[in-house]
């Protein structure tokens, strides 16, 4: 998929742990190894000029890939064309990394990549530290993408000059983690037009960019407000670049199903037709200016006037223009749901599975694993439900429908209060399972209709946040599991450990979905093992339903993309086998359509962590320590699963010795 979409997905999904310790040595200023200034974004003269490409700090998860595409060593990664603008520097005069110790090189190279993406700099809260203002959006051009890959290739080429066997174990591991992430990105160069830039799902670029500006762009100073208006002014140019990329994607049949494009058209038209006062882009700035201490009446009026003009004359019309472009695409589209319809669709899906799971599992293997897990978990659910008086012959929809009726629902502030109480209860329960309990602050906030965890910024100005759903009634039996998954001991806990661990910034910023989501699903089970459900058997059924939900994904994702399932077939299978309501399932299947491979990471990662734990238990017997095991898992930041397995094997060998 295009590099801009990888960055978009990583930021928008908030799946990666993007946290660095404030007291660490900052990324050093570096001289770019090549000229990477994109022609599409020219900062004002008063703003430091920065290269406008993407950052691997929030890139796609790492390899291994299937044997047909997986580079085994850095030397096997296809070399970038050796032109003056893309060639790795051949001499110390041209290569500022020459002669650097490994750790310093990695820190400098990673810092350079971070500063190349304005949106990533904002997400990490590194603008002040890097001397980069938050006044640009990442370009979406093929040129921007090519420059990014060239920088990444140069880093891989230089990394290959080090003899890792001579480095410390810590530096060697960090280099392997970083190389894995870069290798995954570079392997994706063959699929730069396969991703979906516009759809009805939340990762659609127009939806993402509004969310990014209204949720992540800092608005605490007048300079922040000026930067916000500058970014608003870039939206029309980004939409024109998006249209060019969509044309390239359509040429290889990389187009979402017609119905998803038709919904996207409605969304774009609604946004473009709204009055200024109803625009979230305008309201965000207006509300923020009311809280900025040095925002006088005059400056407020001037900034709002500028924003109003930009939104009315440029931004909203660009939404309407894009809507007509997408409407024409929809008229040419069909209803096929999977990426199998794309040119090289099978290879693209194999890449998605490998990069997302960091394993070499094939689509068929994942599908068969899913069928087996669905059968196993449904049997466990029926057994547990029978002890509560439920008929074991009930279907999943019937069983969980009755469970919801018996336990009731929560809404609004009640949901927030319940989630906070669950966190207060689980922290002391799981403390004995860890060597270190993080101190980073975590807050439960109003998530509207959404449920997710967002890491805090690097400067501590925004704490980790668990967004609890308040607008949609939530089955009470399911609240414990979602809280443990998103907060403690799941995403919030894992991200806080990474924040406080003594690991380099370029590692703390890595994102491997199979690790983070695998840990969060494992955390649900860990809460059960630590007694969180002992007095809440209904909640335990919610936990099992959640695990079943993730197992069903193992069937549906390859069903759609490898076995040519229709959209309705996927919806029907999921409703019948999870007991989840149909509207929610439809939104889930739409997600799987446009993010191939991501949905399988939860169960794949959880099963790998459990397998490694059982291996360590079997090998170490009475000397096995659960807190030590968890410290190995969490103490190095996010990892590709093959490297995690190696760490556990080394831990076992060390303790046996």
PLM segments and residue spans:
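Sec-dependent N-terminal signal peptides
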Residues: 1-28
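Ser/Thr-rich, Proline-interspersed low-complexity disordered segments
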Residues: 23-94
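N-terminal maturation segment of proteins
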Residues: 78, 84, 90-657
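Intrinsically disordered, low-complexity, compositionally biased regions/tails
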Residues: 8, 20, 49, 63, ...
């Amino acid at each position: 998929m295009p590099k801009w979409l990888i960055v978009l997905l990583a930021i928008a999904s908030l799946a990666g742990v993007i946290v660095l310790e404030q007291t660490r040595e900052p990324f050093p200023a570096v001289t770019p190894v090549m000229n990477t200034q994109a022609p599409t974004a020219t900062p004002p003269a008063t703003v430091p000029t920065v290269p406008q490409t993407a950052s691997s700090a929030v890139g796609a998860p790492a390899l291994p890939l299937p044997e047909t595409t997986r580079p085994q060593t850095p030397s096997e990664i296809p070399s970038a064309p050796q032109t003056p603008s893309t060639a790795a520097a051949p001499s110390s005069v041209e290569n500022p990394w020459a002669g650097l110790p490994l750790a310093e090189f990695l820190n400098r190279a990673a810092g350079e990549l971070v500063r190349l993406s304005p949106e990533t700099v904002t997400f990490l809260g590194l603008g002040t530290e890097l001397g980069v203002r938050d006044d640009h959006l990442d370009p979406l051009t093929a040129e921007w993408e090519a420059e990014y890959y060239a920088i990444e290739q140069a880093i891989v080429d230089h990394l290959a000059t080090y003899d890792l066997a001579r480095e410390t174990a810590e530096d060697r591991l960090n280099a392997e983690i970083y190389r894995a992430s870069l290798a995954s990105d570079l392997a994706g160069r063959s699929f730069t037009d396969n991703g979906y830039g516009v759809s009805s799902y939340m990762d659609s670029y127009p939806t993402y960019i509004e969310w990014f500006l209204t949720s992540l762009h800092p608005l605490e100073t007048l300079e922040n407000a000026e930067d916000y208006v500058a970014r608003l002014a870039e939206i029309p140019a980004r939409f024109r670049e998006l249209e060019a990329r969509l044309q390239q994607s359509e040429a290889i049949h990389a187009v979402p199903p017609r119905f998803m494009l038709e919904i996207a058209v409605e969304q774009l038209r609604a946004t473009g037709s709204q009055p200024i006062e109803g625009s979230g882009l305008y309201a965000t700035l207006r509300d923020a200016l009311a809280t900025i201490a040095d925002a006088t009446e005059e400056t407020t009026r001037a900034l709002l006037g500028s924003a109003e003009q930009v939104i009315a004359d440029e931004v909203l019309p660009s939404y309407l223009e894009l809507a007509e472009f997408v409407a024409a695409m929809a008229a040419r589209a069909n209803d096929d749901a999977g990426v199998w319809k794309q040119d090289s669709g099978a290879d693209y899906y194999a890449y998605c599975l490998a990069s997302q799971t960091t394993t070499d599992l094939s689509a068929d293997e994942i599908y068969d694993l899913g069928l087996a897990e669905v059968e196993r978990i449904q049997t466990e659910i029926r057994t547990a439900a029978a002890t509560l008086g439920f008929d074991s012959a009930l279907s999943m929809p019937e069983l969980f429908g009755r469970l919801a009726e018996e336990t009731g629902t929560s809404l609004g502030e009640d949901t927030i209060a319940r989630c906070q109480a669950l966190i207060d209860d689980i922290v002391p329960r799981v403390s004995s399972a860890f060597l270190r309990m993080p101190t980073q602050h975590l807050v439960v906030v109003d998530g509207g209709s959404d449920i997710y965890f967002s890491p805090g910024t690097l400067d501590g100005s925004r704490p980790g946040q668990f967004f609890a759903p308040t607008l949609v009634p939530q089955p009470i039996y399911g609240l414990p599991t979602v809280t443990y998954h998103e907060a403690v001991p799941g995403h919030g806990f894992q991200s806080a450990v990474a924040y406080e661990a003594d690991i380099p910034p370029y590692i703390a910023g890595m994102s491997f979905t199979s690790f983070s989501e695998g840990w969060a699903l494992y955390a649900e089970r860990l809460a059960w093992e630590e007694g969180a459900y002992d007095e809440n058997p209904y909640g335990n059924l919610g936990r099992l339903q959640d695990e079943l939900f993730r197992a069903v994904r193992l069937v549906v994702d390859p069903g759609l993309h490898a076995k040519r399932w229709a959209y309705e077939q996927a919806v029907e299978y999921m409703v019948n086998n999870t007991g989840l309501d149909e509207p929610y399932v439809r939104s889930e299947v739409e997600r799987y359509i446009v993010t191939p491979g991501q949905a399988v990471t939860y169960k794949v990662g959880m099963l790998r962590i459990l397998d490694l734990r059982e291996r360590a238990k079997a090998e170490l017997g009475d000397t096995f320590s659960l807190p030590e095991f968890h410290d190995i898992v969490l103490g190095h930041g996010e990892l590709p699963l093959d490297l995690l397995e190696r760490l556990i094997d080394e831990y076992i060998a060390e303790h046996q010795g």
